Amino acid sequence: MSNIDLSASSNLNVENTLVPMVVEQTARGERSYDIYSRLLKERVIFLVGQVEDHMANLVVAQMLFLEAENPDKDIHLYINSPGGSVTAGLSIYDTMQFIKPDVSTMCIGQACSMGAFLLTAGAKGKRFCLPNARTMIHQPSGGAQGQASDIHIQAQEILKLRERLNEIMAGHTGRGVEEIARDTERDRFMSAHESVEYGLIDKVLERRVGGE
């Protein structure tokens, strides 16, 4: 079966880049971390680029690790993604709902398609965008090939997934399922403040305040 995708059509492949290292002094001497591992110690997870199986497995593993480390402390998920695979995204979504800690979500840059779906899946009251971030919602898409009967089966699967995604998004945004279905017929782009009005997020953060 072909992979069903929920992503912005203009996405770009993210090239591997040099990851900065952080050196800390400890009682046992110097210890170095890559920047993402150091931020993981602060319970920060980055969801960056295309949502696909390998990336989803890493995000899920990090959430499970942080839950085991402290089940009562929030996890902070920073999202900058054009979207991607529906099944990979749903594995992240289900884990967010399954684990004990609240998962706070923050859009930096863009949260499109499956990225927007995961953004709105954060704990109520803890879903944020930076002021110039953009979000976009639309319906899933997928390519099908083979015999006519196979194409029909795959088309039915896409329709079932679309219905389920609309139901989930309706629950998180407070919108009706029919309204979500209409709004996702085509690409719907929103600014950070429009995302608040729609119910995708709870607040636009312009500056860190207190424990935010």
UniProtKB/Swiss-Prot annotation:
Q: What is its EC number?
A: 3.4.21.92
Has the keyword Hydrolase been applied to this entry? Answer: yes
* A GO MF label: ATPase binding
Q: Is Repressor there in the keyword field?
A: no
Fetch the InterPro entries from UniProt: ClpP, ClpP/crotonase-like_dom_sf, ClpP/TepA, ClpP_His_AS, ClpP_Ser_AS
Name one matching Pfam family. CLP_protease
- Could you state one GO cellular component term attached to this entry? cytoplasm
Q: What is its main location?
A: cytoplasm
Q: Which SUPFAM superfamilies match?
A: ClpP/crotonase (SSF52096)
Q: Which PROSITE patterns match?
A: CLP_PROTEASE_HIS, CLP_PROTEASE_SER
An example GO BP is: protein quality control for misfolded or incompletely synthesized proteins
Q: How does it assemble?
A: Fourteen ClpP subunits assemble into 2 heptameric rings which stack back to back to give a disk-like structure with a central cavity, resembling the structure of eukaryotic proteasomes.
Per its database record, what is this protein's job? Answer: Cleaves peptides in various proteins in a process that requires ATP hydrolysis. Has a chymotrypsin-like activity. Plays a major role in the degradation of misfolded proteins.
Q: What is this protein called?
A: ATP-dependent Clp protease proteolytic subunit
Please spell out the taxonomic lineage of the organism that makes this protein: Bacteria, Pseudomonadati, Pseudomonadota, Gammaproteobacteria, Cellvibrionales
